[in-house]
Design a protein with these regions (language model features):
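Active-site-adjacent structural elements that line small-molecule/cofactor binding pockets in enzymes
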Residues: 1-214
Length: 214
């Protein structure tokens, strides 16, 4: 739902309203997908009309977020909760427990919900090369992205993350290493979190294209 004030200022909308605007937008999207005609007058949007063609089958909506309100919205308004790539396993499992409780409160069966997961993945022929790539491309981009006003827990003030510190920071968060290391990490998320749909982010700005294609 966004978190950077300049992005909201650019469009003249309030950062404080982002959650309510997001929820209203989701309700409107579902109405447009499923109803022949929509006459909608909400707090933020007013629409009278229809869209064509309609989806030939239901389109699942996966919602992210970590806060209690985000998890509640994912249960009430979405078809799955899809965690982002940076939370460690402990935080994943704690949020999953809350999300499943929200599903029950919403009258939904937790066992029927998909369990997707997004992870940053860096795989190379050797473990050493994978960690080298992770520092050079993944962590550098995290520092560029989150080094400003909103401090991501993975980002410190240092210009470079020592490999030993990088390993500690990314344990149970990222999937980094040689193929065997990556298989082991993915299986761990499957055994503990129950992931059934893994979204691997394999490309990071500046990373050699030939490496990605391999």
């Amino acid at each position: 739902i966004g978190y950077r004030p300049p992005e909201f200022e650019l469009y003249g909308v309030s950062l404080d309203d982002r959650g309510a605007r997001y929820a209203e937008m989701l309700k409107l999207i579902r109405a447009l997908w499923t109803q022949d005609s929509v006459d909608f007058a909400g707090r933020f949007y007013t629409i009278k009309g229809t869209i064509e063609p309609k989806p030939s089958r239901p389109i699942p909506i996966w919602l992210g977020g970590w806060g209690d309100l985000s998890l509640k919205r994912a249960a009430q308004l979405g078809d799955a909760w899809v965690p982002g790539p940076t939370a460690n396993l402990e935080k994943l499992l704690a949020a999953q427990t809350k999300y499943r409780a929200c599903l029950v409160d919403a009258g939904k069966d937790p066992s029927a919900a998909p369990t997707p997961l997004t992870r940053e993945v860096v795989v190379a022929d050797t473990r050493e090369r994978a960690w080298e790539l992770a520092e050079k491309y993944v962590m550098v981009n995290y520092r560029d992205e989150y080094g400003g006003g909103w401090k991501h827990p993975l980002i410190g003030s240092q210009d470079q993350t020592p490999v030993d510190q990088l390993a500690a920071l990314t344990t149970d968060r990222f999937v980094i290493g040689n193929p065997d290391d990556c298989v082991k990490a993915i299986r761990r998320f499957g055994d503990t979190f129950g992931v059934d749909r893994l979204i691997c982010r394999l490309y990071f700005p500046g990373m050699p294209h030939d490496h990605i294609m391999r």
